[in-house]
Amino acid sequence: MNLNDVIKGPLITEKLDKAREKFRQYSFIVDRKATKHDVARAVETLFKVTVEGVNTNIVRGKIKRVGRSIGKRPNFKKAVVTLKQGDSIELFEGGAA
């Protein structure tokens, strides 16, 4: 799998922000077909960091209603990457600009 196609974007929530500060864990939305090895390789090459571990899970899309019509948001794969002590990703560290 092409490394540029593995990571779709960052996933930033309050809970994941606390995990980043306390445990050096960063979260990404990744391609559903990507394996843990693909995610680790992509993060290491794109951000120049050392990955210690990768946890993945598939988040089921929620059912949403607008009036009478019912729709469903798509499922997506979430990857939580743990980095080596001292490494960080600047994409997550930036403040308000």
From Swiss-Prot:
One of its GO terms (molecular function) is structural constituent of ribosome. GO terms for biological process: translation. The keyword Ribosomal protein applies. Keywords: Ribonucleoprotein, Ribosomal protein, RNA-binding, rRNA-binding. It comes from the Bacteria. GO terms for cellular component: ribonucleoprotein complex; ribosome. Gene3D superfamilies: 3.30.70.330. The keyword Ligase does not apply. It holds the Pfam family Ribosomal_L23. One of the early assembly proteins it binds 23S rRNA. One of the proteins that surrounds the polypeptide exit tunnel on the outside of the ribosome. Forms the main docking site for trigger factor binding to the ribosome. Part of the 50S ribosomal subunit. Contacts protein L29, and trigger factor when it is bound to the ribosome. Belongs to the universal ribosomal protein uL23 family. This is Large ribosomal subunit protein uL23. It comes from Myxococcus xanthus (strain DK1622).
